[in-house]
Design a protein with these regions (language model features):
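Conserved beta-strand hairpin/beta-sheet module of binuclear metal-dependent hydrolase folds
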Residues: 7, 14-81
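Metallo-beta-lactamase
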Residues: 88-98
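Hydrophobic/aromatic beta-strand patches that form the interior of the parallel beta-sheet core
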Residues: 10-12, 92
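Basic/polar N-terminal segments that are highly enriched at the extreme N-terminus
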Residues: 1-6
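Beta-rich strand-turn-strand
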Residues: 82-87
Length: 98
């Protein structure tokens, strides 16, 4: 296996939504009113030759419209790893919001 076959994978939390357990599950559960926030992540997958971003997240304005707290912009989360978001050519989108 060469070094180009080995990737590092980073989960980068950028925001959250305060909510209760019942909001996170479809079926009734114990303690439905207990706090259970939902965290929001983007992913960076990289090796010496390539960087792939999984999902792109949202900014402060979109977070506010959706009632979410954005702790840092996704581009800033990537920058914490030395990744310039504007130079990434490969992006995987796992789902859409509408």
């Amino acid at each position: 296996m060469s070094s180009s076959d080995t990737y590092e994978i980073y989960a980068l939390r950028y925001g959250f939504l305060d909510r209760n357990r019942q909001s996170n599950f479809r079926d009734p559960i114990d303690n439905p009113d207990a706090e259970m926030s939902m965290d929001y992540y983007i992913w960076a997958i990289r090796n010496d030759e390539r960087t792939v971003i999984v999902d792109t997240g949202f900014d402060h304005g979109e977070g506010k419209r959706r009632g979410r707290t954005v702790e840092r912009l996704p581009a800033a989360a990537l920058a914490s790893l030395g990744i310039n978001a504007t130079l990434v050519e490969d992006v995987v989108i796992t789902h859409l919001h509408y």
